Amino acid sequence: MTSVTDRSAHSAERSTEHTIDIHTTAGKLAELHKRREESLHPVGEDAVEKVHAKGKLTARERIYALLDEDSFVELDALAKHRSTNFNLGEKRPLGDGVVTGYGTIDGRDVCIFSQDATVFGGSLGEVYGEKIVKVQELAIKTGRPLIGINDGAGARIQEGVVSLGLYSRIFRNNILASGVIPQISLIMGAAAGGHVYSPALTDFVIMVDQTSQMFITGPDVIKTVTGEEVTMEELGGAHTHMAKSGTAHYAASGEQDAFDYVRELLSYLPPNNSTDAPRYQAAAPTGPIEENLTDEDLELDTLIPDSPNQPYDMHEVITRLLDDEFLEIQAGYAQNIVVGFGRIDGRPVGIVANQPTHFAGCLDINASEKAARFVRTCDCFNIPIVMLVDVPGFLPGTDQEYNGIIRRGAKLLYAYGEATVPKITVITRKAYGGAYCVMGSKDMGCDVNLAWPTAQIAVMGASGAVGFVYRQQLAEAAANGEDIDKLRLRLQQEYEDTLVNPYVAAERGYVDAVIPPSHTRGYIGTALRLLERKIAQLPPKKHGNVPL
């Protein structure tokens, strides 16, 4: 049934149409103006008010909030769907449910699309999909980052297989753009079905707490098929994808927080893989490193506890090495490893660091995959990698073994070995066994390896090694009735003094320098300047076979 308000609006529209003479130049301009005004609110002001009542912005307002003021240039604003099935021909709103175009963020060009959930629930139809494909291709062609603001509910069922075909074209473009231009997805509402795969193919996914959801099948379908009851937030909310699935890279407190994060993220990324990341002007230190030490540098000399089993927060190291802020990625997921962006002497760097406060810094499946993904992202976009190592090994347990720690842990090996960007490693404390190899070892292709005097580089820790190295001696002592615990402690100390230090590795060239912790920032800065002109080539190949 048509409301009185709707009838009045239609009458006014017909009246306006009657007053426009489209056979004159003035009339043609008036017609254009009318259509452009209509495209701003394709389904009316009531729909806009409902969006605002939920504390959310409209698709267009989100673009304005993210981009520089007055920089947005819209494309295909007058596009309409072509379907006539199920009476769709009677409702053909301009734009077809997605706003596309380009603009600037902090003066840098970006391409963008924003899905409009007020039009057919944000469902994807043929024209809707064509608009996204078009702006994707524009971003690839011009070498500009692509930002997708997602708020849609799957395929437009009334348009049939054509919707699925457009999904496939969008996915393929995501793949073609991968490693060529940065792709960032914001999830600003419920994204279901086919709508979730495109964000998953992009470089970064940002969600909003208590507002965003992502899932393949919703709660109703799950209950019907499995009998399991779950809410939308539990199934696919920001916390779920941040802490459990690892799909989200940041969980924002609100829409503006999400936009601020995107702006900061882009400040570390180049527009495409053929250029370098933005670099801020910073005066290079002159003179010896020890003459340029700050109070923050000196604090590193007392940061590592005397006991090798006492944890410390690796963030305390990271913040003292960087110029200013540390933009952490996936902070709530696999917290035994820390990854994110920062700057040293104005140069963007990617930080990969073990976190001793979680699982003692051990690598597990999730940490390996998180770090591997981040390393590949840095390598795609020419961002040097700095590894901070304090790793006692891979996390033991049947759960890890059964779920594929061998194959999935190898992803980090593969990512690091394949990366050709400058690679710098700092061993702060433990670097044991296979985890030593994985975390930026010299023979895995690291360019500059540094170690602190507190570094412990060995096949394994003293407590485990003594049982192997001194097995016969311990057995004989036990047979003679000696104090085994006292002997074991003495042998552990002997093992630590002999092998568990940075100097054996330094003697053999596996470590380039053993340095005071306070000198770390200075050494990294000089290494970054040296490696600016690094030339590295991989053997010709179609592509490698990552252990997926």
Curated annotation (Swiss-Prot):
Induction and repression of expression: Expressed at higher levels during the exponential growth phase.
Pfam families: Carboxyl_trans
Regulation: Carboxylase activity of the AccA3/AccD5 complex is stimulated by interaction with AccE5.
First and last residue of the signal peptide: none
Ranges where the record places region Disordered: 1-23
Bridged cysteine pairs (disulfide): none
Domain CoA carboxyltransferase C-terminal stretches: 295-541
Biological-process GO terms, alphabetical: carbon fixation; lipid metabolic process
UniProt GO molecular function: acetyl-CoA carboxylase activity; identical protein binding; propionyl-CoA carboxylase activity; transferase activity
GO cellular component: acetyl-CoA carboxylase complex; peptidoglycan-based cell wall; plasma membrane; protein-containing complex
EC number: 2.1.3.15, 2.1.3.-
Keywords: Lipid metabolism, Transferase
Catalytically driven reaction(s): N(6)-carboxybiotinyl-L-lysyl-[protein] + acetyl-CoA = N(6)-biotinyl-L-lysyl-[protein] + malonyl-CoA; N(6)-carboxybiotinyl-L-lysyl-[protein] + propanoyl-CoA = methylmalonyl-CoA + N(6)-biotinyl-L-lysyl-[protein]
Biased composition (Basic and acidic residues): 7-21
Domain CoA carboxyltransferase N-terminal residues, every copy: 25-281
Pathway, per record: Lipid metabolism; mycolic acid biosynthesis
Biological role stated in the UniProt entry: Component of a biotin-dependent acyl-CoA carboxylase complex. This subunit transfers the CO2 from carboxybiotin to the CoA ester substrate. When associated with the alpha3 subunit AccA3, is involved in the carboxylation of acetyl-CoA and propionyl-CoA, with a preference for propionyl-CoA. Is also required for the activity of the long-chain acyl-CoA carboxylase (LCC) complex.
Similarity remark: Belongs to the AccD/PCCB family.
Subunit composition and interactions: Forms homohexamers. The biotin-dependent acyl-CoA carboxylase complex is composed of AccA3, which contains the biotin carboxylase (BC) and biotin carboxyl carrier protein (BCCP) domains, and AccD5, which contains the carboxyl transferase (CT) domain. The AccA3/AccD5 complex forms a dodecamer, and can associate with the epsilon subunit AccE5 (Rv3280), which stimulates carboxylation by the complex. Is also part of the long-chain acyl-CoA carboxylase (LCC) complex, which is composed of AccA3, AccD4, AccD5 and AccE5.
Protein name: Biotin-dependent acetyl-/propionyl-coenzyme A carboxylase beta5 subunit
Species whose genome carries this gene: Mycobacterium tuberculosis (strain ATCC 25618 / H37Rv)
